[in-house]
């Protein structure tokens, strides 16, 4: 069976690649090992948080993380063991936590954040129906030191709105007096990620994009400097262009003789119902404990914690209890009605820079992975970049790849 473009992976990045490739007139086939109704793209916070917000690795983060570890509030939990890549990842994370690297990354976040916003607008214009709100990201601070530090970065551009405790409670009615204040980053947005994924699926299927669900790619067939065949557990598929967007699963990446400095970071979320008057008025992030709380059409979702160096796909009840405990320290008591707990793995690089671009060996293979906790933020932008790259034909001809790919970042 021969295809023009095969996208391996049906998450937000894979679907965004399929969307932009289809827009260029290509015949696209998406291969997804699951039934396409659940996955990391469904369970995340839904933040489009590219603006005026530092990456995970930034100055001071190492010391701050160690302090939070002592209180069991750290955003990262490391399962230490005999895994050399974990220590390589940590070393890169630490060396990336400098002012120069952070300044560059923030600038890139802004550039590709606006591209993602444009792509979300295009999706809505195309008739897709999903929860989408451009009403900012409320950064709530629980430590006076970090609040003062954030205030020093605010300017009069309109991108920031500084709120005291009383004003913060108007946005976050359940907040208690243990908070210090907040800053509304007005340019950010949020979506219901599940609605985005389902809308993309429906749009693409109606447009003639082929979907092979419950079909797992298990290997590749190579010939010289090309991938001659994509081998699934059902068939062999040939393709002119193959886009590998399999998220945190490194199996197929390793089949292509690559071993990216990327870890599967296990994240958690709880989705629940609460009275409308108690819901946060916009997407919010308790910045000092790295916990997001996002309003949706009928529910609210909290997300937190990233565990590194674990393959356990089961929900850790201790982590869920810890999330609730950390949130309770800064909120009034409230009921999480009809709560749904979730966990999933994100492809996290140590500096928040994804792996994008043509493979160094196989000329018809394009990589699109490594967005970590920023999949919803940058997924649509990545789809556009990858589609443009397919026209350019080489990494070096595409400025966005040269700027935003880990292949070209020290």
Swiss-Prot record:
It is a peripheral membrane protein. Its cofactor is FAD. It is found in: Cell inner membrane. Signal peptide: none annotated. Its main location: membrane. Catalyzes the oxidative deamination of D-amino acids. Has broad substrate specificity; is mostly active on D-proline, and to a lesser extent, on several other D-amino acids such as D-alanine, D-phenylalanine and D-serine. Mediates electron transport from D-proline to coenzyme Q1 in vitro, and is involved in the electron transport chain from D-proline to the c-type cytochrome in vivo. This is D-amino acid dehydrogenase.
């Amino acid at each position: 069976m021969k295809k023009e473009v095969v996208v391996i992976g049906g998450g937000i990045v894979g679907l965004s690649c399929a969307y932009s490739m289809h827009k260029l007139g290509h015949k696209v086939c998406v291969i997804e090992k699951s039934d396409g109704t659940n996955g990391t793209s469904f369970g995340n916070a839904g933040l489009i948080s590219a603006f005026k917000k530092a990456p995970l690795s930034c100055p001071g983060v190492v010391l701050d993380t160690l302090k939070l570890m002592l209180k069991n509030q750290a955003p990262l939990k490391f399962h230490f063991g005999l895994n050399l890549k974990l220590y390589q990842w940590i070393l890169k994370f630490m060396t990336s936590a400098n002012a120069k690297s952070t300044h560059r990354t923030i600038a890139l976040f802004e550039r590709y954040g606006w591209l993602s916003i444009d792509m979300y607008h295009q999706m809505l214009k195309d008739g897709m129906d999903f929860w989408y709100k451009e009403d900012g990201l409320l950064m709530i601070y629980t430590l006076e030191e970090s609040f003062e530090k954030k205030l020093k970065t605010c300017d009069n551009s309109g991108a920031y709105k500084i709120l005291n405790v009383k004003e913060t409670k108007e946005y976050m009615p359940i907040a208690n007096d243990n908070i210090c204040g907040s800053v509304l980053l007005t340019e950010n947005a949020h979506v219901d990620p599940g609605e985005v994924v389902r809308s993309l699926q429906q749009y693409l299927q109606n447009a003639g994009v082929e979907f092979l669900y419950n079909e797992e790619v298990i290997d590749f067939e190579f010939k010289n400097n090309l991938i001659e065949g994509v081998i699934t557990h059902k068939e062999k598929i040939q393709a002119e262009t193959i886009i590998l967007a399999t998220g945190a699963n490194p199996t197929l990446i390793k089949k292509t003789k690559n071993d990216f400095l990327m870890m599967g970071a296990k994240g958690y979320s709880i989705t629940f119902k609460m009275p409308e008057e108690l819901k946060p008025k916009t997407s919010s992030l308790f910045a000092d404990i790295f916990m997001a709380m996002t309003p949706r059409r009928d529910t609210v979702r909290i997300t937190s914690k990233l565990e590194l160096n674990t393959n356990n796909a089961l929900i850790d009840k201790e982590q869920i209890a810890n999330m609730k405990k950390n949130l309770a320290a800064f909120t009034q008591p409230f009921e999480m009605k009809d709560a749904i707990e979730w966990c999933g793995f994100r492809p996290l690089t140590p500096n928040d820079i994804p792996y994008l671009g043509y493979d160094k060996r196989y000329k018809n293979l394009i990589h699109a992975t490594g967005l970590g906790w920023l999949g919803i933020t940058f997924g649509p932008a990545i789809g556009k970049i990858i589609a443009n790259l397919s026209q350019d034909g080489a990494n070096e001809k595409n400025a966005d790849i040269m700027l935003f790919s880990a292949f070209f970042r020290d």
